[in-house]
Amino acid sequence: MTPLARFRKVVVGGTFDRLHLGHQRLLSVALELGDRVVIGVTTDSFVREEGKKGVEPFEERVRAVRRFVEEKGASDRVEIVPLEDRYGTTLEDDEMDAIVVSPETEPVALEINELRRKRGFPPLSIVVIPFVLDGDGRKISSSRLRGEVDEGPCRDD
């Protein structure tokens, strides 16, 4: 068991586009809390269904997540899975006991728990991680980063 682990199996999911400090915080907490961690990364088709534009390809996002997990020395206890919908494997895996989310995705975790109850699975403990803010007090987000990359910094040289 890892020193800070409180749960046997933790799940966390997301698009993880342009892996930023907010993602890293979410993943770090999941790694701290779980003996085993399932990380769901949204597939390209799910990203399209959600109407997101300019998102890095699935394999690139998985590589970034895998690299982060390796840097944390946690590869041996992490499973990275494709996320085809909002629920991933949370409605099928009765060994999961916690889910790590942002305030933005907390409603999905509540929905997951309701669906788990209906299937006879125990609800997941929901761990909500506050947003990481930039120097201006704004939420760090992939959509903002995509916008800044698309527009680029304006410089008069």
UniProtKB/Swiss-Prot annotation:
GO BP field: coenzyme A biosynthetic process
UniProt xrefs under Pfam families: CTP_transf_like
Entry keywords, A to Z: ATP-binding, Coenzyme A biosynthesis, Cytoplasm, Nucleotide-binding, Nucleotidyltransferase, Transferase
EC number: 2.7.7.3
Molecular function terms, GO-annotated: ATP binding; pantetheine-phosphate adenylyltransferase activity
Signal peptide, first to last residue: none
Pathway recorded for this protein: Cofactor biosynthesis; coenzyme A biosynthesis
Designated name of the protein: Phosphopantetheine adenylyltransferase
Location within or outside the cell: Cytoplasm
Top-rank EC class of the record's enzyme: transferase
The UniProt record lists the keyword Cytoplasm: yes
Function recorded in the entry: Reversibly transfers an adenylyl group from ATP to 4'-phosphopantetheine, yielding dephospho-CoA (dPCoA) and pyrophosphate.
InterPro entries membership: Archaeal_FAD_synthase, Cyt_trans-like, PPAT_arch, Rossmann-like_a/b/a_fold
Family the entry assigns: Belongs to the eukaryotic CoaD family.
GO terms under cellular component: cytoplasm
